[in-house]
């Protein structure tokens, strides 16, 4: 794993202030992995969970999947996302979603464009455009533990971390947290009714979904 994944890291990750944000989020989110979990890794910041699973030794104790069909192995990140290194098996996407739709996952790691005070998530409607929801709704609706991985703000955010201390060097001009999301990709009300565990992991803190909305459960050193 290490030889290939580190080689891919060097060409697929742009080392910048933004990669620091992704690293902080990915490291914290990866702590939600449990031995024998069957896991879905979403595109974007959630890809970092795979890398920290590798670094912590959890990669050999869980089964990572991506919606394109790979099961087991190490998901490739960046522009090649969807491919798997050393996959145990590869199915077509329709069969992969049979696994997802029938509750075959233990935990999923997904991105988010907006989150509101109730815990609803918009993952498909951006400013002036519809990105498309893809398999997001299927995966998040049936998975017992859902971990959203996203930055607290966007557009211009710059973050550094030294010795575990997080510093916001420049705040982003767009807040990901809003009173009401533009469109609901993930329903907090339905998640509560289904008994799902839902976390919202950012580069500065972690929230958990409760029947009363979002509850702040962690604040990182320096914030």
Give each language-model segment a name.
Residues 5-88:
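N-terminal active-site beta-alpha-beta segment that forms phosphate/nucleotide-binding
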